[in-house]
Amino acid sequence: MTCNLLVILGPTASGKTRLGVAAARALDGEIISADSRQVFRGMDIGTGKDLSEYGDVPYHLIDICEAGSEFSVFDFQERFCTAYADIRKRGRLPVLVGGTGLYLDCVLRNYRLVKVPENPVLRAELDPLSMDQLAERLRALKPEQHNTTDLGHRERLLRAIEIAEGEKACGETGPVLPGLRPLVFGVRWERAVLRRRITARLKERLDAGLIDEVQALLDAGVAHRMLEHYGLEYRLVSQHLRGELNRNDMFQKLNSAIHQFAKRQDTWFRRMERQGVQIHWLDGAGDPLQGLLRVFMS
């Protein structure tokens, strides 16, 4: 079986972007980002776009939306299909790189997604419910819920329930990519080493101007509410800029939140394996590119 999609996944700060670019360069490929926040323009430092690493390697699904807008899993799958077909048509290898588990899953497990409009009747039914009641309803609809940001933000929670109910009502449609033959690699580090990498990278991002980036988004009209929606760096830096956290508290909370996020990513990847996705794990501390090429060429 010949691979027609190379996939490189891993937790935050694992070096998957660097490996993806190196693999794309070695195999005449183009990158498709599987990161739920890199689609937004102006969110560069906080999302780790690292565009300088790409050089002459073409990339897709980065900087395609205005910050402050919404971008759903359905939108990602639709855009992925377009980018994938375009790359294959030109005889090159699509290289899907990222750590957003739901985006990876919707491609690798061929989710049947539908575009779900807002449902005012359902919204009226949900409006009296508490956050705990809403979270319980979402878990009942989607027991595998991965994105805990949805559970702490009322508007995201309402929309997640709306989408889950809409998908349930519509049922399955036809397969999205019936001819997909993916080869999946993951970048793995010892936990203590990854923790050090996460903390070091956070310090680098703050030194590189992360706070100024968030302030620029606010100055451009992106509401604090949307920054809360985007989670992690954007939520906590926004709270710092509102005077709710001093810089040290912001750093400590953000560092802890990113460590927890990396654990949830690992949990999601293990779940993917249990559900039949074969992941070839590479040692981030070794030479992951050579390991990848050996498997690819075998």
Curated annotation (Swiss-Prot):
Residues engaged in binding substrate: 12-17
Gene Ontology terms for molecular function: ATP binding; tRNA dimethylallyltransferase activity
Keyword Cytoplasm: no
Site (Interaction with substrate tRNA): 100
Keywords from the UniProt entry: ATP-binding, Magnesium, Nucleotide-binding, Transferase, tRNA processing
Protein task: Catalyzes the transfer of a dimethylallyl group onto the adenine at position 37 in tRNAs that read codons beginning with uridine, leading to the formation of N6-(dimethylallyl)adenosine (i(6)A).
PANTHER family linked: TRNA DIMETHYLALLYLTRANSFERASE (PTHR11088:SF60)
This protein's name: tRNA dimethylallyltransferase 2
Taxonomic lineage from the root: Bacteria, Pseudomonadati, Thermodesulfobacteriota, Desulfuromonadia, Desulfuromonadales
